[in-house]
């Protein structure tokens, strides 16, 4: 039969590229699990009362090429003015070697958070370098491996200051009046839920206020003034006040380290180390503190440890501080950092080295001096005598200056009374400075750049002598070796080879949704139309962004069944926080601000209680029954007991136990009956899209992990995006922004992120995914994710019991394998199996969550049958190895499992094990071998001997 033109056009071609198993393989797997079709399987598993009758109307699929052309046209509506707005965001020059070999390399951007250090040594080393940069520039003892953005870091600094303060009765936090406005915005949001009073005043008046536990200063103020806070910090320390200082990485190359002046905490944005502005993000924040406060720090910390052979190895240290263990007692709810962006900044510093960075910083400062000298020579007044890269220029006819700037396609900062702000950066040239003279003075100014340069080179006093850095930075060999592109390329490749990412194997992590991040989805993020926009540029310059965000928001509204979407949260955890704040403010608007009880099932991810605590709520745990479902009787009892103060429930659907709970609508009804709201955690949205939706189920608010369900890559531990969907009654209470009015949002609430649309430059990834999949493709993706999980469960259930199942013995999109009986019989643990999987070429599933002693497996729809079978065969082979231990063939203390993983050097080392080298490193005929570079990490040694800066190069060799 002749094919139709529509069939030949094959507009849904990408669906087959994204979904792993083809139609024939899907049928094979359906036969294996005993289902006739995908629809039949879905019908068996998903409760009938929540199944959508028709897929959400998000349009038909488009080809990769059509979608790219459509988005390119939208991006073309953005206007690429030269922005001198500053306020914590500047243009950058991302070295092409880093762009090509890292940002555009799936070996870097598809990796997961390095919870399995044996398969993560490359990015752990890059993150350790990031920590070393932070330590050198801030002058402090301990640094984390990045936070979400500078404003979030400021809020974390305030929370940490309260935790470590010895002034236990003090409840006030002082903020200098010249911090960036978006920083103050996020600090105020956090302070409100914690019950802190925020005082905003001139820094000189910090000592005038009583009952202050912490102070936030900004080394280079938002309008450019360099402050020497040494004396003030000393006086504050004498009063036992915790001092936090916001700083700028590039400025710190030349300026005195705040830690040397006595600061307790120093933080800021690493954006200008090679990360494009991207209309607000994603960017990595840096965070450092004194050693005595290390256990109260937020964020991940990379530490140097040893492996089982005594070799130097890296790992994430002090994880007991984090939300997945400490829950509501955690230092922060944030489980996403900004690894990919931190590593760009890290490699930027490695590539340029201390000499190159000083050259860049001095060039920026020289051009700023030249601009200042010329303006002053022509009679204009500068607000500040001391500056690094930013001038605050008083102008008589501000409107005329701004009009000339617009005509020249230049953005100046315009929100300063009777003045304009101008921030220069590493992209600024002498020609740009000449153009700025024309804008500020008119064309007939007669200034000469070369003459001005000679003058300022001989007599620059714009950085006060007391603030000039007098110590060396970045002296470690890693920052002084890789300065040719050849060396840099090879260094980055050597790091990449140490890690296991999706370009090598399936990453079957439960609750993480490690699906394909397609090349077509990634291409737009580096387009200059998206990458180069300042987040505070005039809205008419960002019409392309607004159209793309509006379309994506509309699609997400239809997919979730909600009425509105807020794009601001930078991670799922931040989305939880924003959603809970919306609930809190909704209750307050009804004069029910006393409602502060948050019900959370015992099975919940640790982020849930941590977020509830951060939103000022009290956690009450709801029991689960023997099948892992929410115990309805206990829920009713708790809801009724706390009816007067019930704020909400946080539930995950499908549940964290990997099943579709039959009573989810009843759960929603019970909570609503007693005046509460329903927060449905979107972590498992990949099993809902096109089949059901949170709004249809009965929830009021959810966050969506765009880095899970909607294809933003995990980046080795960030970036992420956690926009929230809300019903209409909560829409007025989503985050707003103090600098930018968010179109279509009536909210007057404070911000949770520095930028109005969070990490806007990665939203095109999700736009592309939805556009290329269309309604039918999205539904099919969810169905195949369910099929793949049930196929694995069906084939492994005789070797490893599946802990929880729903109707007909089915699971949702993931399954929990119970290792506890095996451990009781043989002594082999889930940890041993996880590490042995590395020898088979796999990343481990999720260990001991949500149930200790288990492995949770989520294959996603992107994995084909061949890869699923390879994983299943590996798990069955490992089960056979466990039986060998059980039978006494191999002793418990010396077998391939407890010694896993095995490294290449063991092949030529002395061999005294009761199993062969072949069994160790080529088990079950593994052909495409991944080689870990370290053996199993010694976690106890790492935490007892905390060391979080770069080690000698020889230790890596």
Swiss-Prot record:
It comes from Salmonella paratyphi B (strain ATCC BAA-1250 / SPB7). GO terms for cellular component: cytosol; glycine cleavage complex. One of its GO terms (molecular function) is glycine dehydrogenase (decarboxylating) activity. It catalyses: N(6)-[(R)-lipoyl]-L-lysyl-[glycine-cleavage complex H protein] + glycine + H(+) = N(6)-[(R)-S(8)-aminomethyldihydrolipoyl]-L-lysyl-[glycine-cleavage complex H protein] + CO2. This is Glycine dehydrogenase (decarboxylating). The lineage of its organism: Bacteria, Pseudomonadati, Pseudomonadota, Gammaproteobacteria, Enterobacterales. The glycine cleavage system is composed of four proteins: P, T, L and H. The gene is gcvP. It comes from the Bacteria. The modification N6-(pyridoxal phosphate)lysine is found at residue 708. Gene3D superfamilies: Aspartate Aminotransferase, domain 1, Type I PLP-dependent aspartate aminotransferase-like (Major domain). GO terms for biological process: glycine decarboxylation via glycine cleavage system.
């Amino acid at each position: 039969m002749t094919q139709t033109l529509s069939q030949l056009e094959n507009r849904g071609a990408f669906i087959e590229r994204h979904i792993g198993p083809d139609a024939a393989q899907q049928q094979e797997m359906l036969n294996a699990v005993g289902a006739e079709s995908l629809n039949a399987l879905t019908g068996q598993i998903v409760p009938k009362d929540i199944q959508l009758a028709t897929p959400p109307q998000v349009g038909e699929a488009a080809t990769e090429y059509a979608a790219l052309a459509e988005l390119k046209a939208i991006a073309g509506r953005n206007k690429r003015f030269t922005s001198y707005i500053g306020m914590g965001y500047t243009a950058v020059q991302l070295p092409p070697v880093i762009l090509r070999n890292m940002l555009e390399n799936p070996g870097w951007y598809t990796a997961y958070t390095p919870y399995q250090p044996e398969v993560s040594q490359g990015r752990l080393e890059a993150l350790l370098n990031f920590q070393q940069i932070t330590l050198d520039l801030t002058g402090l003892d301990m640094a984390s491996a990045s936070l979400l953005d500078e404003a979030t870091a400021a809020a974390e600094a305030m929370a940490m200051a309260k935790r470590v303060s010895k002034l236990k009765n003090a409840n006030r936090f002082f903020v200098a009046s010249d911090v960036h406005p978006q920083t103050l915005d996020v600090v105020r949001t956090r302070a409100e839920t914690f019950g802190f009073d925020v005082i905003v005043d001139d820094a000189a008046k910090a000592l005038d206020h009583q009952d202050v536990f912490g102070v936030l200063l900004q080394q280079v103020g938002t309008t450019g003034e360099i402050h020497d806070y040494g004396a003030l910090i000393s006086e504050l320390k004498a009063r036992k006040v915790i001092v936090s200082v916001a700083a700028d990485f590039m400025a710190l190359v030349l300026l005195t380290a705040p830690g040397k002046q006595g600061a307790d905490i120093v933080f800021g944005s690493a954006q200008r180390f090679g990360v494009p502005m991207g209309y607000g993000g994603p960017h990595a924040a840096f965070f450092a503190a004194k050693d005595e406060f290390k256990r109260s720090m937020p964020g991940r910390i990379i530490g140097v440890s040893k492996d089982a052979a005594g070799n130097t190895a890296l790992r994430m240290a002090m994880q007991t501080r984090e939300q997945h263990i400490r829950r509501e007692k955690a230092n922060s709810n944030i489980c996403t950092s900004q690894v990919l962006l931190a590593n760009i900044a890290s490699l930027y510093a490695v590539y340029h080295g201390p000499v190159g960075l000083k050259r860049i910083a001095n060039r920026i400062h020289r051009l700023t001096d030249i601009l200042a000298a010329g303006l002053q020579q022509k009679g204009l007044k500068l607000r500040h005598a001391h500056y690094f890269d930013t001038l605050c220029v008083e102008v008589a006819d501000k409107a005329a200056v701004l009009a000339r700037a617009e005509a020249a396609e230049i953005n100046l900062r315009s929100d300063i009374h009777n003045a304009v702000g101008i921030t220069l950066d590493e992209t600024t040239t002498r020609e740009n400075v000449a153009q700025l003279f024309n804008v500020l003075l008119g064309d007939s100014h007669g200034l000469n750049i070369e003459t001005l340069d000679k003058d300022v080179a001989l007599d620059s006093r714009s950085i006060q002598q007391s603030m000039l850095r007098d110590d060396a930075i970045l002296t470690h060999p890693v920052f002084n070796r890789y300065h040719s592109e050849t060396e840099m390329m090879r260094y980055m490749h050597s790091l990449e080879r140490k890690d296991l990412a999706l370009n090598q194997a399936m990453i079957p992590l439960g609750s993480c949704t490690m699906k394909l991040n397609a090349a077509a989805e990634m291409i737009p993020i580096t387009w200059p139309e998206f990458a180069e926009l300042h987040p505070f540029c005039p809205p008419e310059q960002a019409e392309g962004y607004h159209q793309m965000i509006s379309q994506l928001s509309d699609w997400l509204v239809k997919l979730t069944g909600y009425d509105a979407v807020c794009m601001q949260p930078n991670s799922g955890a931040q989305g939880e926080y924003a959603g809970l704040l919306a609930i809190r403010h909704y209750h307050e608007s009804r004069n029910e601000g006393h409602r502060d009880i948050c019900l959370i099932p015992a099975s919940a991810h640790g982020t849930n209680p941590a977020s509830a605590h951060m939103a000022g709520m009290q956690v009450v745990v709801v029991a689960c029954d023997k099948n892992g479902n929410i115990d309805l009787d206990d829920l009713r009892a708790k809801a009724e007991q706390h009816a007067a103060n019930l704020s909400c429930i946080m539930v995950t659907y499908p549940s964290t136990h990997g099943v579709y709970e039959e009573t989810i609508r009843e759960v929603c009804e019970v909570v609503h009956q007693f005046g509460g709201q329903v927060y449905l955690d979107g972590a498992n949205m990949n099993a809902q899209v096109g089949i059901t939706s949170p709004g249809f189920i009965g929830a009021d608010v959810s966050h969506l992990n765009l880095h899970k369900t909607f294809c933003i890559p995990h980046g080795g531990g960030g970036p992420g995006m956690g926009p929230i969907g809300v019903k209409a009654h909560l829409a007025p209470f989503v985050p707003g922004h103090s600098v930018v009015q968010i179109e279509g949002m009536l909210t007057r609430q404070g911000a949770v992120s520095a930028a109005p649309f969070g990490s806007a430059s990665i939203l095109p990834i999700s736009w592309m995914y939805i556009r290329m999949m269309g309604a039918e493709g999205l539904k099919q993706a969810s169905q195949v994710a369910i099929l793949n999980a049930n196929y694995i469960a069906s084939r492994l259930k005789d070797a490893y019991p599946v802990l929880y199942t729903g109707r007909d013995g089915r699971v949702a999109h993931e399954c929990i394998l119970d290792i506890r009986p095996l451990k009781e019989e043989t002594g082999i643990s889930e940890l041993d199996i996880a590490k042995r999987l590395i020898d088979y070429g796999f990343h481990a599933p999720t260990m001991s969550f949500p149930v200790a002693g288990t492995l949770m497996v989520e294959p996603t729809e992107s994995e084909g049958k061949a890869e699923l079978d390879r994983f299943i065969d590996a798990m069955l082979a490992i089960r056979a190895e466990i039986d060998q231990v059980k039978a006494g063939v191999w002793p418990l203390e010396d077998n391939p499992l407890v010694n896993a993983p095995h490294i290449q050097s063991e092949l030529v080392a002395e061999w005294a094990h009761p199993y062969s080298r072949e069994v160790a490193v080529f088990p079950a005929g593994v052909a495409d071998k991944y080689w870990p570079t370290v053996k199993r990490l010694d976690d106890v040694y790492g935490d007892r001997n905390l060391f979080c800066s770069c080690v000698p190069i020889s230790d890596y060799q």
